[in-house]
Every structure is written in C-alpha cells, then in structure tokens.
From Swiss-Prot:
It comes from Arabidopsis thaliana. One of its GO terms (cellular component) is mitochondrion. It is found in: Mitochondrion. This is Uncharacterized mitochondrial protein AtMg00880. Keywords: Mitochondrion.
C-alpha cells in the first residue's frame, strides 16, 4: 500500500524517489511516452553497437527465415567434391539425400577381397551387380570388375554355354581365393 501512498503524494519527504509516483501514473494512464521522467534507466538510451545499415531489416529477416527451411540449404549450395572418377557429387554429409529412394547395394566402394572374405562368390556378385572398384553412381550400370582385366561383356560371354559341376565351381573359387590373397599380400 506504500506504492499507492507514494503515487497519491509524490512530494512527501519519506519518498526516496519523487519521480516514481509520476512514472506509475504515466504507466497507468496509458501508453503515451511523452511525459516519461528522465531518471534512472530512462535517462540515456541503450548503447547498441551498429552493425551496418538497417534499411531492409524486416524484409531481410523475413527472407532469411523463409530460406532456412530444412532441405533448402544443402540443395542450394552443397560443396562440390570431385571423386576419383571425376564426377562431382554433393558433399559427403548430404550425399545420399537426393540420390535414389532406396539405398543401392553399392553405396560404398567394395573391393573383391572384401566381398570374397564375406563369403560371396563371383556368380552371386555378378547377379547382384555390386560395384567393386568404383563408388556407386546410380546414373550408370554398376558392373563387376573381373580379375584379369576382362571387360564385363567378355566376362559375361565367358559363362555362356558352360556347365560347371559343383567341384569345378569350388576349384575355381579356390583359385580365385589364392589369386586374391596373393594380390593382397603384394600390397
């Protein structure tokens, strides 16, 4: 209730701040700023460093807020990374986002040694069409690199018309394993 007394009698001796009563009356009477007392925090304006011209402040902030939708920034300026085969693709962070709806089998480069250690044989590799040497690019067909430098077409005709029994297939797989381990030991 002391506040009401002060606002009623602002010139009293016990009042520590005589302008407080006027200030309260001003706030209660309405939102006009004409008769604000020049005391305390209202005496000097807030010191704010200027960050350049403030001409288009509202419009610019509105535009920037609109442009900050998810999925805009990485599509607009994704850093171009040139891979070993010369193709440019989006940066590694957003690489797979706009590629294909399903993640392809060859989303990372896999070598023959890696796949053979996992237990694949060359027929299943050929049927799955897993790229071994080069990273995946959905624009082209990912053919398997055949050992011996055969092109995929030659390797494809290699299988035609040949009926392999099971022990012959196992023997071929053993030879392929030996070749792979010899090559990997050479590095």
């Amino acid at each position: 209730m002391t506040t009401m007394k002060r606002s009623a009698d602002p010139e009293a001796e016990e009042d520590p701040d005589p302008s407080l009563g006027k200030f309260i009356e001003q706030v209660v009477s309405g939102p006009t700023q004409k008769g604000f007392p020049a005391s305390g925090a209202f005496a000097t304006p807030r010191a704010r460093r200027s960050r350049g011209p403030k001409r288009f402040l509202g419009k610019r902030n509105y535009r920037r807020a609109r442009a900050r939708k998810p999925g805009k920034r990485d599509r607009a300026h994704s850093s171009k990374v040139r891979s070993s085969d010369g193709s440019t693709r989006p940066s590694a962070r957003y690489g797979m986002r706009f590629r294909s709806p399903t993640l392809p089998l060859c989303s990372r480069p896999r070598t023959w040694e890696f796949l053979l250690d996992l237990g694949y044989d060359s027929m299943s590799l050929k049927s799955a069409r897993v790229a071994s040497e080069r990273p995946c690019d959905p624009g082209r067909a990912n053919h398997v690199w055949e050992p011996g430098g055969l092109s995929p077409e030659q390797a494809q005709w290699d299988w035609v018309g040949k009926v392999y029994s099971r022990d012959r297939v196992l023997k071929l797989m053993g030879e392929l394993h030996e070749l792979v381990y010899r090559e990997s030991g050479r590095r």
